[in-house]
Amino acid sequence: FYQFFASFEFLEKQYFVSMFAYTLELLEKNETYHSYTSADKLSAFYFTFFEMATANRSFVIHLLKEDKNPMKNLGKLSKLREVYLEYALTILEKPIKIEQETVVKIQDKVLQEASWLQFLSIFNFWMNDESPNFEKTDVFIEKSVKASFDLAYNIPTQSVIDFGKFLWKEQMNGMFSKS
């Protein structure tokens, strides 16, 4: 065991990295994936990742709710965050073409972190989703990706309002109050 992992905590972190790697492996096997838009690539990633998470749902939820301290549980995603941010940088297009290197780095960081926050919000929604076949998580993914890309790359449109209505409805149904 110690030849591969320094601790059980590291093993838990590596579990999520392995899920990430397998998700990308599955996506890479899809011949059309490389021709997808950034939004479609991100959606495909989320759908595939959460399909895999669903296959191991009890274990994943156990890992992320094991400790009473939510920050300690979130720490189990630290290695996943590292690889996810690299992935996000490769697929997300810059909304504004800027020549100044410092500003480009800031823009890249903002895009990466916003994408990570979106991923965490989907993760949290999925953990609390009690709908059949986690259909509401699928809707959450669709609406949040559409709204975030509209906000970043276009003038916010109906998708932002649509996503807001969905969130409001789920808040009223108690989806976000569970933890």
Where are these regions (language model features)?
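An amphipathic alpha-helix adjacent to DNA-recognition modules
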Residues: Y2-E28, T32, S43-F50
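Hydrophobic/aromatic residues within well-ordered alpha-helical segments
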Residues: Y15, M19, T23, F45, ...
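Helical hydrophobic small-molecule/effector-binding pocket
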Residues: D40-L64, K79-E93
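Short acidic alpha-helical/loop segments enriched in Asp/Glu that coordinate divalent cations
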Residues: V60-G75, T102-V103
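Amphipathic alpha-helical packing segments from all-alpha helical-bundle domains
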Residues: N73-K97, K109-S121
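All-alpha amphipathic helical-bundle segments outside canonical DNA-binding/catalytic cores
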Residues: I98-A114, F134-V139
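Short glycine/serine- and small hydrophobic-enriched flexible loop segments
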Residues: S121-N128
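C-terminal peripheral helix-coil segments that are non-catalytic and often amphipathic
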Residues: N128-S179
